[in-house]
Amino acid sequence: MKKFILLIIFYLIYFISFSQKTKSEKVSVEKSILSIQTGYFGTWINHELKLHNQFALRTEIGTEYRLKFAIKQSFDSLKNQVSIFLEPKYYFNLIKRESKNKNIKNNAANYISLRTNFNILNNLENGEIYFHTLTPTYGIRRNITSHFNLELSFGYGISYSNSVITLEAMPSFRFGYVF
């Protein structure tokens, strides 16, 4: 009987020792996500790559409309442009959503990010090329079904174009499909 009890204790210790991951180590962003999104402000194809448990790097190409406001002027223009984005994201409430048994598949959580982009085609007649930097963004992504999602975000950042610095509001309302 002693041997049997020792054997059970040994097996319990053995199995418990392999389940030592904390909840924060178990909850993580998806390894790789490829999706297409459309919204009022444009259409995009994007890819998110896991960097760490709560960090992802999003690369994106798309066409979009952008509101532009000059620093010392009023409303300037509404432009359509093709853009390439590079956006590191920090998903800050993955653990909280998981603990409440909410869906976090395909990185369905709140995030903050720092967007950078380069516009490929813009106003070619005037030779304008915009390079956007320092656009902090807050957003949320929620799943509608297993492949469809909704993403809302807002950022306000600085852009540089032909030696002119402007401030830009970057609202986004996107409906997407994850492959």
Provide a role label for each language-model segment.
Residues 38-42, 61-67, 90-92, 116-122, ...:
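Transmembrane beta-strands of outer-membrane beta-barrel pores
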Residues 32-36, 57-61, 84, 108-116, ...:
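Transmembrane beta-strands of outer-membrane beta-barrel proteins
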Residues 1-27, 175-179:
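Bacterial Sec-dependent N-terminal signal peptides
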Residues 24-68, 73-77:
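Start-of-domain marker
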Residues 49-53, 92-94, 120, 142-146, ...:
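Outer-membrane beta-barrel strand-turn architecture
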Residues 28-34, 39-43, 78-84, 128-134, ...:
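Residues that define the transmembrane beta-barrel architecture of outer-membrane proteins
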Residues 82-98, 167-179:
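Outer-membrane beta-barrel "beta-signal"
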Residues 21-31, 54, 93-109, 144-148:
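Short loop/turn motifs that connect adjacent beta-strands in outer-membrane beta-barrel proteins
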